[in-house]
Regions:
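Conserved "HGTGT" condensation-loop signature of ketosynthase/thiolase-family condensing enzymes
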Residues: 1-108
Length: 108
C-alpha cells in the first residue's frame, strides 16, 4: 500500500475479502520505497521471480501488523519457501495508479 493508515487497512481488507483469510502477503516497497510510475513493472518482475524461485521475501521492518488489517499471512522476519501456481501483484500508488496482475506458472 501507500503506507497510510487508511490505505493499508483498506487494501489488506479488500485482499482478504477477495482471496480469503491466511493468504501469504509481503511488500517490496519496504525494500525500494515509492517508485511511482515504475511500481507496476518492478512489482511484476519481483513477483514472477519469487514464484520462479519458490522463495518469498518478507516485508522489511514489519513486526506487528495493524490489528485492523485483513487476516492475511504477513511474511515477516525471514524469506519463506513457498510453491505456488499463481501469484498476484497489486500496486496501489499515489495519484490513482492502481493495478492488479495475476501470473500463472508456466512449465517448460
Amino acid at each position: 500500500g501507500t503506507a497510510t493508515d487508511r490505505g493499508d487497512v483498506a487494501e489488506s481488507q479488500a485482499t482478504q475479502q477477495v482471496l480469503g483469510s491466511g493468504k501469504p502477503i509481503s511488500s517490496m516497497k519496504s525494500y525500494l520505497g515509492h517508485t511511482l510510475g515504475a511500481c507496476g513493472a518492478i512489482e511484476a518482475w519481483w513477483a514472477i521471480e519469487m514464484m520462479r524461485r519458490g522463495t518469498f521475501a518478507p516485508t522489511l521492518n514489519l513486526t506487528t501488523p495493524d490489528p485492523a488489517c485483513g487476516e492475511l499471512d504477513y511474511l515477516m522476519d525471514a524469506w519463506r519457501m513457498l510453491e505456488t501456481e499463481y501469484i498476484m501483484s497489486n500496486n496501489f500508488a499515489f495519484g490513482g495508479i492502481n493495478t492488479s496482475l495475476i501470473f500463472k506458472r508456466i512449465y517448460d
